[in-house]
């Protein structure tokens, strides 16, 4: 068992780049962990068809930093609701990337089934939205407003009860 903890595996990104990493680091991904269990120690490279090299390297960087963390369980829901947007300092710095990379990391974390990374990415986006008006959110994420002024007024009236007063 100790030998597999330090053994290396190879991942192949969507753009064909092979990256060799420690098995323990790769197993932060439930998808990769399950693939390794299914393949055994065949030594074959594991294809990651939905993630390109630059994003995969960022995900691996996060996994290396968090390789010693306990695996997440379904029991942490109560704790995660309490601290909905708390992110530790290292993760905050890690997530200081351009928006495109941030969303690619979130998509990769979802695909690779790395719940803790997915949570950090989503909390980062939540913090970007927190306290902003719809107009500010549209500007932040370059979203075009497709409502007519009349539709906007109607939506505001229908949701007036939810406004902070």
Swiss-Prot record:
Keywords from the UniProt entry: Ubl conjugation pathway
Name of the molecule in the record: E3 ubiquitin ligase complex SCF subunit sconC
First and last residue of the signal peptide: none
UniProt GO molecular function: DNA replication origin binding; ubiquitin protein ligase activity
Record Pfam families: Skp1 (PF01466), Skp1_POZ (PF03931)
Residue ranges, annotated region (Interaction with the F-box domain of F-box proteins): 106-165
Subunit structure: Component of the SCF (SKP1-CUL1-F-box protein) E3 ubiquitin ligase complexes.
Gene Ontology biological process terms from the UniProt entry: exit from mitosis; G1/S transition of mitotic cell cycle; G2/M transition of mitotic cell cycle; kinetochore assembly; mitotic nuclear membrane biogenesis; negative regulation of cytoplasmic translation; negative regulation of mitotic metaphase/anaphase transition; positive regulation of D-glucose transmembrane transport
One cellular component (GO) term of this entry: nuclear SCF ubiquitin ligase complex
Gene3D superfamilies attached to this UniProt entry: Potassium Channel Kv1.1, Chain A
Pathways per UniProt: Protein modification; protein ubiquitination
Name of the encoding gene: sconC
Biological role: Essential component of the SCF (SKP1-CUL1-F-box protein) E3 ubiquitin ligase complexes, which mediate the ubiquitination and subsequent proteasomal degradation of target proteins. Controls sulfur metabolite repression, probably by mediating the inactivation or degradation of the metR transcription factor.
Family designation: Belongs to the SKP1 family.
